[in-house]
Design a protein with these regions (language model features):
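N-terminal leader/targeting and accessory segments in enzymes
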Residues: 1-94, 252, 354-355, 381, ...
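Phosphate-binding loop of NTP-binding sites
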Residues: 8-11, 91-224, 228-238, 428, ...
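Acidic, Mg2+-coordinating active-site environments of NTP-dependent enzymes
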Residues: 12-13, 71, 75-78, 185-331, ...
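Mobile, glycine- and charge-enriched loop segments
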Residues: 35-46, 133, 151-160, 347-368
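Active-site beta-alpha connecting loops in nucleotide-dependent enzymes
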Residues: 51, 317, 335, 339-408
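Short beta-strands and strand-loop turn motifs
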Residues: 72, 105-108, 134, 185-191, ...
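ATP-dependent carboxylate/acyl-activation modules
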Residues: 110, 318-320, 443, 447-451
């Protein structure tokens, strides 16, 4: 991270410094909350987790090389510097906000109900053709992960592409206050997190909190094909730019041609030009992601050649529509997360396979009071597509199995309460050369299924 002294940190978070004068003016090398990732001269912030209290590890982190610790407790007779704060979690956010303000780079904030990560990856791939880009790693998109991502920004970075994930009102405002985006991208307004946000209108309200702390001279990029986002009016005097498959959008695509599991070809139209590109990851939703990347590239002064190269350089992440070919199976690893819209999109991809189509689906979380019906509808959708075999695992997924079984379809349906139950029957269900889609909410830990299938 860029230079920041303990004095600067104490002032930023309103903490009280305890320690020697010399250390007060020393710079920290990084900020960590995991005692296992301590490095020389880092700042360790003792976060209280649901299972572990970081305060337990403060002495060990100092022995391992940390310069200072942030603590909510007075440390009697401490032989090392520490900063006393009311809340370590709030201090983490305050320090990140201060650090972000000190940085001279462009920030792209990406949010939405579905496709945040794949859109973030596409935008980073496009912008990476011209700029030195830092992007959110893994699922570091919440009020803990975003600050840690901010601290990874170095002086050489020219653009940061940050994923912002929320599940309740007020969270986006707090994230935007830290990120201070120059460009805001919203992928869609779906039904994820209905448990807290109650309706799609509630989700729209929560997601558009991202505009509250954006650069007043920045850009807003929205999916114009989304019925909710298409109603968004200028925010803070900024006229939104819309992308989509409809030719009335500012950025649109047509002549979309599926290459099966090998990706998609499309022709892209900008306000000034037209060009074609190949996307290596399958699915129509990836065309929308590419359009978001094109709009972001235009906002940052890129030309068509650079943008096309960035689109075609994109590679999938593990657990995100990642195609894995083994001696016996073709696996579509999309197990990182799931909601009804993303699961249906993945089923559309599977339906393009020219071998026997098998999907292993699990529970989708945080869908609110209509969760059973939504699982039922996903099962019905799989059957209507004519997927050969549907395997449903988990308590909620029993409704998925019911939704498929009640259709007049060729789809064979198997239901298991647990992953272990499925593993016992997998050899009976799967055939050599099958194409297998694996998808569920992250809490279902379906990466275990992917790992087992890779070894068959």
């Amino acid at each position: 991270m860029k230079n920041m002294t303990l004095k600067e940190i104490a002032v930023a978070c309103g903490g009280i410094y305890y320690g020697d004068d010399e250390s007060y003016y020393k710079e920290v090398s990084s900020v960590v909350i995991d005692s296992r990732k301590v490095e020389k001269d880092c700042l360790f912030i003792a976060i209280r987790g649901t299972r572990v209290d970081g305060h337990m590890f403060i002495p060990q982190t100092i022995r391992d090389g940390a310069l200072c610790a942030l603590s909510e407790k007075r440390i009697e007779n401490a032989s090392y510097p520490y900063i006393l704060v009311t809340s370590c979690e709030q201090a983490l956010k305050d320090i990140a906000e201060h650090y972000r303000k000190s940085l001279n780079l462009k920030v792209v904030g990406v949010t939405g109900s579905v496709g945040k990560t794949s859109t973030k990856e596409m935008i980073a791939s496009v912008l990476g053709e011209k700029y030195d880009v830092l992007k959110t790693a893994g699922n570091f998109n919440n009020e803990i992960g975003l600050p840690l991502t901010i601290f990874n920004i170095r002086e050489e970075h020219e653009v940061a592409v940050l994923e912002l994930g929320i599940s309740n009102f007020g969270e986006m405002e707090r994230l935007a206050k830290i990120a201070r985006p120059d460009i805001c991208v919203i992928t869609n307004i779906g039904v994820a997190h209905l448990e807290h946000l109650k309706s799609r209108d509630g989700i729209l309200k929560a997601k558009t909190e991202i505009f509250l702390y954006m650069n007043p001279n920045g850009s807003i990029i929205l999916n114009g094909d989304d019925d909710k986002l298409s109603t968004v009016h200028p925010a803070n005097g900024i006229q939104p730019v819309f992308f989509g498959l409809d030719d009335s959008r500012d950025f649109y695509a047509d002549q979309v041609e599926s290459c099966g599991l090998r990706g998609t070809n499309a022709v892209f139209h900008t306000p000034n030009s037209t060009f074609s590109a190949h996307i290596s990851i399958p699915g129509e939703h990836m065309v929308l992601n590419a359009l978001a990347g094109i709009a972001a590239g235009y906002a940052l002064g890129m030309n068509d050649e650079e943008i096309k190269a960035g689109i075609e350089a994109l590679v999938p992440l593990a657990g995100r529509n990642n195609l894995i070919e083994t001696d016996s199976l073709t696996i579509i690893d999309d197990c990182y997360n799931a909601n009804p819209a993303s699961t249906k999109a993945s089923l559309d991809v599977l339906a393009k396979a020219d071998t026997r189509q098998v999907t292993v689906l699990g529970d989708m979380f945080e869908l609110g009071p209509t969760e059973k019906q939504m699982h039922y509808e996903v099962g019905k959708y799989a059957a209507d597509l004519g997927i050969d075999i549907l395997v449903c695992i988990g308590q909620l997924s029993e409704h998925m199995a019911t939704g498929a079984s009640e259709q007049c379809s060729k789809t064979q349906v198997f239901y298991f309460e647990t992953k272990d139950d499925f593993f016992e029957q997998a050899d009976r269900i799967l055939n050599p050369k099958d194409t297998v889609l694996v998808k569920a909410s992250n809490g279902m830990k379906f990466s275990e299924i992917v790992n087992v299938l890779k070894e068959r």
